[in-house]
């Protein structure tokens, strides 16, 4: 006789249901906060497993990257084609303090800009900001008609395209290397750099739809908690205790 498990005897009663365990009981919610550079600081919420044993929830949250539409952060549909990446750098209670981690255009916006009868000009440059972030900036532009031009096409010569690219690189290096990452974010929202390039290239060939279409963070700067808290409108020197006044005197009892 073979020794083994008797399947007939081990069968349980029919109709018994397995205990349903809610997976969200082991998780907790955290609020994602954007820097004060943006008008709306409440980005959303994210989930993480609760701290158990040697596994700390904070370790799993730091370094998370979220992608948000700039229209949601600024409360304006004019920025609906721009995407911002935010990276979680610090956890305070149930709040996740983030910093800028990237910028990009939606693919449909880039495709809508490309049209016939015009030249496309692209340039990119790697720059270090004033606070030691290494970024790669991508710029895109298109030629347009001269004033009172009758000809339908607006194709630029290769020498003109090279001169425009040189101007693009010079302006991007100048505008980015002298500012911090937070100041650069403030320039990206109203497209200050794009207008500077358009103005500088006017003497070479008229341009239109000049945009910084992408910003990539290649290297993070050394983490500075004070700078991050200042970016979120908080102070690292706040004290919870109350200072005791110097007029305090010991009370001497006459009888013990």
Curated annotation (Swiss-Prot):
It is found in: Cytoplasm. GO terms for cellular component: cytosolic small ribosomal subunit. The modification N-acetylalanine is found at residue 2. GO terms for biological process: translation. Keywords: Acetylation, Cytoplasm, Ribonucleoprotein, Ribosomal protein. Signal peptide: none annotated. The keyword Ribonucleoprotein applies. GO terms for molecular function: structural constituent of ribosome. Component of the small ribosomal subunit. Mature ribosomes consist of a small (40S) and a large (60S) subunit. The 40S subunit contains about 33 different proteins and 1 molecule of RNA (18S). The 60S subunit contains about 49 different proteins and 3 molecules of RNA (25S, 5.8S and 5S). Belongs to the eukaryotic ribosomal protein eS1 family. PANTHER family: 40S RIBOSOMAL PROTEIN S3A. This is Small ribosomal subunit protein eS1. It comes from Komagataella phaffii (strain GS115 / ATCC 20864). The gene is RPS1.
